[in-house]
């Protein structure tokens, strides 16, 4: 692991079947999860006979499972959930009734509950399918569910309501809209009015001028960046498909070879953008240059997010 990562959090043990397990955790960080998922894809095939590898904590706890933290002993019977599906956002919103958790201060309460929740539904389900979490002081008139019933409820929504099934963190997208700048002398991405992304925290960091995620990726040999090219001469009705065609060509020559993954794209009043997580920068730039050279762009380039 030290060869692959500058810093990584993991657990190691042996399961009931006698197989060793190496469990990495992104600690709830979606950008970090992408690096761990890439690592998982290249775990040596011959090791899988005796090992299980995970890029996030799996959910394995059953009814009656318990933990102790902050001086509180908590078992599944101590927690009642009032779950409300949100089909617009593909999330389950939770109200939590647990007198034992209410004994803790707010930060401790949320910290312990998230760790407890991960044990039952897995870290990925917590990240992808859990919306807001509120703690209530009294039982509700709503129908309550046990925490061990939550994962089947999520699976039912995936199957019945068409929620996206998590397989690759770079392939689950959400759309966004922005107000483009009206000032002169604007910089890259300030012209964007719509886009989609598989890693909203990265965009938030970019616009807020924060660099921790980008620095951490760089320490692990990974870059987050984007291609940009002018779109003013592209008919408005074709602008998204035009960007998509270029993205498809680059993806076809990079993703199968572990060079990069697309993270989404965006449309501005001057430029179109395609966002990437890049594992082999030199190979990626060579491929991108060759493909973009086939178009008659006056303005085209690459930029790191940082």
Cite the ranges covered by each PLM segment.
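An N-terminal, globular interaction/scaffold subdomain
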Residues: 1-51
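C-terminal structured domains
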Residues: 46-52, 57, 178-306
């Amino acid at each position: 692991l030290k060869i692959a990562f500058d810093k990584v959090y993991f657990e190691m043990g042996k399961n009931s079947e006698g197989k060793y397990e190496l469990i990495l955790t992104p600690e709830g960080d979606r950008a970090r999860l992408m690096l761990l998922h890439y690592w998982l894809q290249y775990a040596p095939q011959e090791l899988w006979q005796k090992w299980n590898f995970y890029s996030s904590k799996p959910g394995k706890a059953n009814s009656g499972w318990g933990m102790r933290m902050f001086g509180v002993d908590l078992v599944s019977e101590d927690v009642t959930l009032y779950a409300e599906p949100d089909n617009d956002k593909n999330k389950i919103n939770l109200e939590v009734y647990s007198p034992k958790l209410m004994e803790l201060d707010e930060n401790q309460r949320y910290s312990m509950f998230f760790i407890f929740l991960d044990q039952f539904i897995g870290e990925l389900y917590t990240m992808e399918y859990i919306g807001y979490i509120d703690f209530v002081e009294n039982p509700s008139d709503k129908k309550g569910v046990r925490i061990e019933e939550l994962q089947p409820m999520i699976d039912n929504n995936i199957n019945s309501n068409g929620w996206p099934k998590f397989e690759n963190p770079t392939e689950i997208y959400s759309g966004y809209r922005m107000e483009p700048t009206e000032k002169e002398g604007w910089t890259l991405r300030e012209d964007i009015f719509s886009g989609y992304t598989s890693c909203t925290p990265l965009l938030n960091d970019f616009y807020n001028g924060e660099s921790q995620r980008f620095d951490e990726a760089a320490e692990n040999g990974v870059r987050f960046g984007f291609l940009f090219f002018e779109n003013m001469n592209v008919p408005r009705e074709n602008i998204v498909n035009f960007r998509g065609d270029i993205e498809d060509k680059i993806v076809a020559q990079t993703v199968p070879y572990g060079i990069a993954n697309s993270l989404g794209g965006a449309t501005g009043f001057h430029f179109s953008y395609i966002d990437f997580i890049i594992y082999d920068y030199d190979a990626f730039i060579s491929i991108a240059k060759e493909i973009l050279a086939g178009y008659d762009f006056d303005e085209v380039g690459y930029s790191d997010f940082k």
